[in-house]
Amino acid sequence: MGIKGLTKFIADTAPNAIKEIKIENLMGRVVAIDASMSLYQFIIAIRDGDQYGNLMNEAGETTSHISGLMSRTIKLMENGLKPIYVFDGAPPELKGSELEKRGEKRQKAEELLLKAKEEGNLEEIKKQSGRTVRVTKKQNEEAKKLLTLMGIPVIESPCEAEAQCAFLTKYDMAHATATEDADALVFGTKILIRNLNANASSNKNKNKNSSKRGYILTEINLEQVLKGLKLTMDEFIDFCILCGCDYCDTIKGIGSKTAYNLIKEYNCIENIIKNIDQNKYQVPDNFKYVEARQSFINPKVLEKSEVKIDWCEPKIEELKTFLIKEHNFNEVRVTNYITRLLKARKVTTQRRLDTFFTTCTKKSTKLIIEESQKELLKAKGKGKKRELNDNSTKLNAKKKKTNIKDEKKNTDKMDELKNKSDENFVKDEENDQDDYDQNLFDEKTNSDSGNIKNENIKEDISSNDITMDIPKCTNDIVC
């Protein structure tokens, strides 16, 4: 579920923290992907026919997650991303009640799905079939095997995948976290990417403006979130707990706006509980906000030294066996995917241009003078002003001394010219003086300015991806 209403609140209150980017902007970047969320989306999105059933092999086992993961990963690599897939470990104990609620919702959805099938209501079948989806342990293991054979790094988190993704950005081992769960921000991810799966699909899944706009993603920058909301990280965590998270109940009657105002006034949940009207706002009897806070601050994750990230060569023959023999994929289609995979690996090895250059700036004389004047005005005490004045006096004296030397040289040269005595004295003197004046006053330097022409490079990548209509994660979908 993530944090209730967080993305909308950030968009309204700290709009500079959210921006749309093209997938090309992530070229050369390492992105940590919430694998469980991705598999869930693939199973929902890839359907066989109008009955919205999953793709299956001859044994009747679902293969939608394999097809989606393989296709999507190659597509991301073709766009220059370097994906790392992070899988969930054991769920935290605090999440037990939330998981029970999800189980109840899933059971209710299954009942509604059965009814919809009896009535032949295709729209309701599609809606309820999505709510009944859950990623099984076997599907997770198959996904890990597929990625390993493709040479893609796989990380198994001891607990929450989005928490591990967030810490990979803290370790500077990844640029961003890709997930639909906004609680990755509460875990401290530097950058959150949303809609990554929805926007790396086949050409059929692009909107009508996609040819001009490209694949559009949503990027949320945590630093800008805190700056825009004017909150510390600790205050932001408490704010998110009050909005509603997976780890504890929240105070009834408090939404995101009220929670924000209370945090701004009282700074933390402890002070809020002491000061609010508890007749108006009902505090849960067993309000485990302290435990929830600690789960966000100190989640169970692998330490940096425990994380191993290796992009390996694909195991082509084993990959063919896994897809064709074990899961009955079409051989021609598999060959096509492998060809694209090998080609895409070359794209991911390209370095970003900003890794080749560093910015070097040289201050102009005008800027130096302005800064000196400001420094003089800001100098505190007569001592600092006197010191600046002394420095200025020394500079002026040095300039004066230089001018005297130049004048002496000029005088000596003039005397030399005057002492010449030949029949063309006057003419020679005038010529020498003209040359002298030209050298002294009319010296010019010609420089050419260069223009760098930015050219847009367009690359059309054809693919045979399965059409994937990825839904955005909403509160009514059981994630």
From Swiss-Prot:
Kindly list the positions annotated as binding Mg(2+) 1.
D34, D88, E160, E162
Q: Which GO terms describe its biological process?
A: base-excision repair; DNA replication, removal of RNA primer
Keywords tagged on the record: DNA damage, DNA repair, DNA replication, Endonuclease, Exonuclease, Hydrolase, Magnesium, Metal-binding, Mitochondrion, Nuclease, Nucleus, Phosphoprotein
What EC identifiers does the entry list?
3.1.-.-
GO cellular component terms given for this protein: mitochondrion; nucleolus; nucleoplasm
What does this protein need as cofactor? Mg(2+)
Say if the entry is tagged with keyword Nuclease.
yes
Q: Known Pfam families for this protein?
A: XPG_I, XPG_N
Region: N-domain; residue ranges are 1-106
Q: Where in this protein does the record put region Disordered? A: 379-455
Annotated region Interaction with PCNA: the residues are 349-357
Q: Give the compositionally biased regions (Basic and acidic residues).
A: 403-428
> In the record's cofactor note, how is the cofactor described as bound?
Binds 2 magnesium ions per subunit. They probably participate in the reaction catalyzed by the enzyme. May bind an additional third magnesium ion after substrate binding.
Q: How is it modified after translation?
A: Phosphorylated. Phosphorylation upon DNA damage induces relocalization to the nuclear plasma.
Residues reported to bind DNA: R47, R72, E160, G244, D246
Subunit and interaction comment: Interacts with PCNA. Three molecules of FEN1 bind to one PCNA trimer with each molecule binding to one PCNA monomer. PCNA stimulates the nuclease activity without altering cleavage specificity.
Described by its record, this protein's role is as follows: Structure-specific nuclease with 5'-flap endonuclease and 5'-3' exonuclease activities involved in DNA replication and repair. During DNA replication, cleaves the 5'-overhanging flap structure that is generated by displacement synthesis when DNA polymerase encounters the 5'-end of a downstream Okazaki fragment. It enters the flap from the 5'-end and then tracks to cleave the flap base, leaving a nick for ligation. Also involved in the long patch base excision repair (LP-BER) pathway, by cleaving within the apurinic/apyrimidinic (AP) site-terminated flap.
Q: Write the protein's name.
A: Flap endonuclease 1
Q: What organism is recorded for this protein?
A: Plasmodium chabaudi chabaudi
